[in-house]
């Protein structure tokens, strides 16, 4: 079996210095600490992940924190889109959240969450704060934009669905990685504070290099327990003489995975992308499904949430 490390060293000119730095140190992405799961080609039905253990890299600090809020830099204005009939309580909360997060004011953000805050992924107020601080430290320049999709009153509770877009430009702190994420979530608000949050959908894109691969992802948003599904990450541009390395990762959504690193293995891809077949677990829950693809011009990592229902 070809040794990928030796192969890369032999053709080092195809991988710029920045890419080598990323491979040598870590990739900041929506990734986490989990045991490798099996990856198979179409026709096989095991969970998605790396197939060949040849070249390791760490994916650190899953930016899943961004789904729960609100990391932005004070130098970039935020944008909140609110319907005209938005209740004052909800309007004030979203406006204050934007202002505090824009300033990197963790106390200002956390005071908008109830002390007994709960989250569909198992977060509480303490773990949320820790996640936000890690996110802001690594990505100090994020553009944050929230749209209120809908709201309704349930007694003294407001239930609001929002779409959050987060865009981060490359910086030294982020190892020159660019971030673009979209998170749809449902919040329960009581007494002007968020008491519960559930992620409905999420998708993130992280890129590095002067010409990262352009990737189309095919993955269902929801599958039933035990159902077979396909996961394709297709590179759009011609490869030319470039090597293409990549892997797929599939892991459960858990609190422990928000901050801890994951080691994954890259495989040499013989086709223009990743083409995997997986089977949903036998119990309901949420999964993170990611594709990492590396070529001479840069790196792209795409992560999407997969809901497993009965």
Role assignments for model-derived ranges:
Residues 40, 45, 177-213:
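Short beta-strand edge/turn micro-motifs at domain boundaries
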Residues 36-99, 103:
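Short, low-complexity N-terminal intrinsically disordered segments enriched in polar/charged residues
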Residues 101-120, 126:
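Short, well-ordered alpha-helical segments enriched in acidic and aromatic residues
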Residues 233, 277-297:
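Short, aromatic- and glycine-rich surface loops/edge beta-strands on solvent-exposed regions
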Residues 133-177, 181:
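Surface-exposed, charged secondary-structure patches
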Residues 267-276:
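Aromatic sugar-binding surface patches on proteins
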Residues 195-249:
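Low-complexity, intrinsically disordered terminal/linker segments enriched in charged
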Residues 299-309:
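Edge beta-strands of extracellular beta-sandwich domains
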